[in-house]
Amino acid sequence: MADEQNLDTQNPEAQAAENAAPSDDLAARVQALEEQLAAAQDQSLRMAAELQNVRRRAEQDVEKAHKFALEKFANDLLPVVDSLERGLELSSPDDEAIKGVREGMQLTLKLFIDTLARHQLEAVEPHGEPFNPEHHQAMAMEESTHVEPNSVLKVFQKGYLLNGRLLRPAMVVVSKAPTTPPPSIDEQA
């Protein structure tokens, strides 16, 4: 045993290497654990951000579903409004025989339009306005000297917006500049 102690004291380099080996192992292990911790923290932050994004998207989807739940139903009701309006346009206000029916149609139409407005459904009536391809569908072009080119001359069918989003475009006739005939030979001479 004395020989072993003697050898240990005679070879301090071996003893230092022996002591250094566990400390190098510990340092490497600490570094590996720190890297794992950093990776876990990064993954945790990413998961928290993803969870927040999923919640936000779900809230937006629910909000849109509430906002536009009536879209299909409202689209199905628009022909009824159109028919009531056409019926009133075609009936004579001076005809005493249908005066009561006409008043009933007017009241029904007003009630219908008020109900649609309560549910954020608004009409697009572009008569005289500049043509807007986002809200209007051009059915025809007509020359006109009375209004500027590319203005709405007539409205065949009103358009509608639901909560600011286009439900149905307005069917319109759009003005265009009159074509000037080429000068004749007599005018050139």
Swiss-Prot record:
Keyword Repeat among record annotations: no
GO molecular function, one term: adenyl-nucleotide exchange factor activity
Subcellular location: Cytoplasm
Keywords of the record: Chaperone, Cytoplasm, Stress response
InterPro entries the record matches: GrpE, GrpE_coiled_coil, GrpE_head
One annotated Gene Ontology cellular component of this protein: cytosol
Cross-referenced Pfam families: GrpE (PF01025)
Compositional bias (Low complexity): 10-24
Positions of region (Disordered): 1-24
Family to which the UniProt record says this protein belongs: Belongs to the GrpE family.
Subunit structure: Homodimer.
Protein name (record): Protein GrpE
Organism for this UniProt entry: Ectopseudomonas mendocina (strain ymp)
